[in-house]
């Protein structure tokens, strides 16, 4: 399931994050430092060092915004969110086809983290650069994603995906992973659809007993499938 979440960050937050990233040249490192064997062969970008104060400061801003976003909570059912990272692609940079690693180690904690969902939060307007589309492959084919600054895309971490070469300008983004309460994508999709239906029924003044029954079904399924 691919889900677009608009306006995770407001324009002022985007400006602040962009300004900090563009003013912090010394914190940028080769993006291959965090790539696995497969990704290292096809990854050509830069990212902010994970242990830098900039990464921690800006990552906390992103996490605070996610906590206040009901669409993100409903779609991802987050158990843990990997500390947000930040990357940039200049001209001729790209990230070839790959699949994200299934398990990551959260830096400095020793905690192993299962990557159920991948997230890209765009920090550059689409007309600021050419190329740089996030291409995500699923059973329905290939999907090209290039969103407004402040918007985010969620997709299964098991997906084959790539970032196409930049031919003009610069692409800035935050990227991270979510370990969901429900690891199976099909189950999360069903719960997400049910949650949206429940919210719609509440807005339309549906019979309360029917809404309560559907809400009970949602929570019983969540109880059955939750992995904590």
Give residue spans per PLM region:
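Non-heme Fe(II)/2-oxoglutarate
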Residues: 1-85, 190-228
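Catalytic core of non-heme Fe(II) oxygenases with the double-stranded beta-helix
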Residues: 70-174, 178-187, 191-192
